[in-house]
């Protein structure tokens, strides 16, 4: 699904979180929203998801105005930073949660859950509970649950922030391979420039609610637009 963000602004009290943001995201791309704390990256992701309403501007999904559309109508999967798994449900039950709500046929539901557990390399953990899993495994369960409803867009809010450096690096490689397999338009938030540069096909760098530069890791490294980009990416 293609995404067009058109002149989006969002204020929280006196704080300008987003200031006339314009961005086009191509169908099937893997995009990283990068920036320091308070830059607006997570707010932009939440506006995309329908979890926050913009003060002005429009969100277009595949050419359709989705600005006022509810999250459940946007065909979007959202993965929260803290995973938001249900501790009293098994891995399989967590993955199947959205399918249960939609009253999907039990055989189709089981088939879909098994496919996702295999895709996430979690086949052996279907009957386990979240507290029996590592952080990396819990993150993969959260991704499987987000993908269960076959969304056209996958949004991830700092998906690896709570993990140690070794696991983060492993999951970055795994997520890149997963995106190559499923080709779902994917947007993730990070404050870690090395993570964005390793994972994203296109990086959107924000500061103070504005987009400062858009480009590949190579383009940002070779042609930084100003001293903020140079300093933030450690190019000095």
Swiss-Prot record:
Question: Where is this protein localized, as stated in its record?
Answer: Plastid, Chloroplast
The UniProt keywords, alphabetically, are: ATP-binding, Chloroplast, Nucleotide-binding, Plastid, Sulfate transport, Translocase, Transport
Entry's CDD domains?
A: ABC_CysA_sulfate_importer (cd03296)
Which Pfam families does the entry mention?
Answer: ABC_tran (PF00005)
What Gene Ontology molecular function terms does this protein carry? ABC-type sulfate transporter activity; ABC-type thiosulfate transporter activity; ATP binding; ATP hydrolysis activity
Asked if the keyword Transmembrane belongs to this entry, the reply reads: no
**Its Enzyme Commission number?**
7.3.2.3
Annotated positions binding ATP: 35-42
Q: Which InterPro entries match?
A: AAA+_ATPase, ABC_SmlMolc_Importer, ABC_transporter-like_ATP-bd, ABC_transporter-like_CS, P-loop_NTPase, Sulph_transpt1
Q: Name one GO cellular component term.
A: ATP-binding cassette (ABC) transporter complex
Domain ABC transporter positions: 3-233
Give the reactions, separated by semicolons, that this protein catalyses.
Answer: sulfate(out) + ATP + H2O = sulfate(in) + ADP + phosphate + H(+); thiosulfate(out) + ATP + H2O = thiosulfate(in) + ADP + phosphate + H(+)
> Which SUPFAM superfamilies does the annotation name?
P-loop containing nucleoside triphosphate hydrolases (SSF52540)
Checking SMART domains in the record gives: AAA (SM00382)
> What's the family?
Belongs to the ABC transporter superfamily. Sulfate/tungstate importer (TC 3.A.1.6) family.
Q: According to its UniProt entry, what is the function of this protein?
A: Part of the ABC transporter complex involved in sulfate/thiosulfate import. Responsible for energy coupling to the transport system.
Name the chain's protein.
Probable sulfate/thiosulfate import ATP-binding protein CysA
In its UniProt entry, the species of origin is given as Chlorella vulgaris (Green alga)
What gene does the UniProt entry assign to this protein? cysA
């Amino acid at each position: 699904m293609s995404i067009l963000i058109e002149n989006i602004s969002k204020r929280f009290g006196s704080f300008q979180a987003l200031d006339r943001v314009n961005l086009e995201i191509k169908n099937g791309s893997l995009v990283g929203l990068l920036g320091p704390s308070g830059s607006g990256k997570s707010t932009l992701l939440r506006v995309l998801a329908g979890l926050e309403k913009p003060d002005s501007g429009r969100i277009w999904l595949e050419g359709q105005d989705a600005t006022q559309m509810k999250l459940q109508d946007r065909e979007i999967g959202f993965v929260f930073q803290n995973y938001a798994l249900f501790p009293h449900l098994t891995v399989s039950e967590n993955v199947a949660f959205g399918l249960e709500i939609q009253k999907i046929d039990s055989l189709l539901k089981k088939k879909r859950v098994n496919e996702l557990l295999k895709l996430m390399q979690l086949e052996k953990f279907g009957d386990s509970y979240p507290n029996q899993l590592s952080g990396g495994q819990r993150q993969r369960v959260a991704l499987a649950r987000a993908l269960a409803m076959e969304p056209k867009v996958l949004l991830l809010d700092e998906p690896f922030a709570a993990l140690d450096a070794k696991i983060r690096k492993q999951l970055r490689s795994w997520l890149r391979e997963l995106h190559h397999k499923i080709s779902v338009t994917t947007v993730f938030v990070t404050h870690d420039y090395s993570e964005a540069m390793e994972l994203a096909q296109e990086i959107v760098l924000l500061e103070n609610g504005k987009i400062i530069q858009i480009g590949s890791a190579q383009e940002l490294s070779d042609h930084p637009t100003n001293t903020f980009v140079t300093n933030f990416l450690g190019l000095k």
